A protein has these predicted regions:
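Short, acidic/turn-prone active-site loops that include or flank metal/cofactor-
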Residues: 7-11
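Active-site helix-to-loop segments that bind/position phosphate- or nucleotide-bearing substrates
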Residues: 12-16, 21-227
Length: 227
């Protein structure tokens, strides 16, 4: 089990978890520390490509076709480990299209509060699965913030962020309390994955396990999630 504590901005600050999530956690941590840089690069890039693609798809779903195409072009030009920061360019187009040209993720408002809260809900699901897989949440693929205890979970969850964005956008005229209630629907709704409709908790479990297997070079297939 995993319990995450948040600060007044609804960002994670601490967590409680068991010492031994699985019987061979020491072996898995040794594997994690030894992950090859080229494999980490390949897996991270595939994950970020899915995030950018999902952002494009969601803008198209909202009939922002021109901006959707702009992000699709960034997707097609993505390079390993994204040296030109296409992920960042995509995010700017995406959020400004959804919430207005004056919107920034640093602003103190109900939209950002809801996004942060929703992302923390997602993060808690992924961090739990990372621990169950026997990995340390602190050691990420590209996320390497020394103050982030959830670097690996932050890396793996990227394609799923548009799930939260969709809920917040659909409720953008409501206050934070109302949006917060809607965000809990992620625990009861089903989503398409591997040709089936599945609960998000089950998708997160399968997705995380497959990413870890790819990093351990036990399975070459990197899973895909599409909104």
């Amino acid at each position: 089990d995993l319990v995450i504590f948040c600060d007044d901005k609804r960002l994670p600050t601490a967590f409680l978890t068991s010492y031994y999530a699985r019987h061979d956690s020491s072996l898995q941590i040794a594997r994690q520390i030894a992950w090859k840089e080229d494999i980490k690069c390949e897996v991270w890039t595939a994950i970020i490509a899915q995030k950018i693609l999902n952002q494009s798809y969601y803008l198209g779903e909202c009939s922002f076709f021109e901006k959707s195409q702009s992000i699709m072009e960034l997707y097609h030009g993505l390079e390993q480990f994204d040296p030109s920061n296409r992920e960042g360019h995509s995010a700017r187009i995406y959020f400004n299209t959804l919430f207005g040209n004056d919107f920034t993720r640093e602003s103190d408002n109900d939209i950002n509060a809801a996004l942060d809260y929703g992302y923390t809900l997602l993060l808690s699901m992924f961090a739990r699965e990372v621990v169950i897989c026997g990995c340390m949440t602190q050691i990420g693929l590209k996320h390497a913030n020394q103050f982030n205890q959830f670097n690996l979970a932050s890396d793996i969850m990227e394609p799923f962020r548009p799930i939260i964005d969709r809920i917040v956008y659909q409720n953008r005229h409501n206050n934070f309390v109302k949006i917060k209630k809607e965000l809990f629907s992620i625990f009861s709704e089903t989503y398409p994955y591997n040709g089936k409709e599945m609960y998000l908790s089950n998708i997160v479990s399968d997705y995380t396990k497959k990413v870890i297997k790819a990093l351990n070079q036990l399975d070459e297939e990197i899973p895909e999630f599409r909104i």
